[in-house]
């Protein structure tokens, strides 16, 4: 007699298939994430209040780059393209040779992961969707702020360099280090972020800001 219902069995099969597909998507032949060359930008000297005001006003961007996720005994590397318009976004995650890809699109209260035009999954938050389908999650809601070099709403502890760039942040259980910035127009934006939470370590490289 089976102890798993048909619905539970289908749910387990779906999660297993997604995990296999995304593992194939993300795992590459190398185990290190190449960083961009050191920026030669001339940084803007500002007070933190001025810098925070300028960065918080940025609500639209197109960025691309790569990221790595390290867990005990496992390293995942992938490329990404991130389009943000207000609170709506679309993130494409793909392998280095563009053989596999998934798309995550979101707006307040609804996030969808697309594996193909006919196969998609939804949840109310990106963290919930990733936990359901992948078994782990990244703080995508907070990355909306961290990717710009500012804290997300809520309590935090922070350290700054002499230019008042945010260089270290502790928030929502995560430790974030901002090791490189680049100048884009009149603002300085993060180029490399390193996140850690327990045994999970994430490195995000932004190659191009638009």
From Swiss-Prot:
Membrane disposition: Lipid-anchor
GO cellular component, one term: cell outer membrane
Keyword Signal applies: yes
Organism: Coxiella burnetii (strain RSA 493 / Nine Mile phase I)
Keywords: Cell outer membrane, Chaperone, Lipoprotein, Membrane, Palmitate, Protein transport, Signal, Transport
Annotated function: Plays a critical role in the incorporation of lipoproteins in the outer membrane after they are released by the LolA protein.
Family: Belongs to the LolB family.
GO biological process, one term: protein transport
Lipid-binding residues (covalent, S-diacylglycerol cysteine): 30
Domain of life, per lineage: Bacteria
Subcellular location: Cell outer membrane
Oligomeric form and interacting partners: Monomer.
Gene name as annotated: lolB
Protein name in the entry: Outer-membrane lipoprotein LolB
Keyword Protein transport: yes
Annotated signal peptide: 1-29
Lipidation (N-palmitoyl cysteine): 30
Pfam family, one: LolB
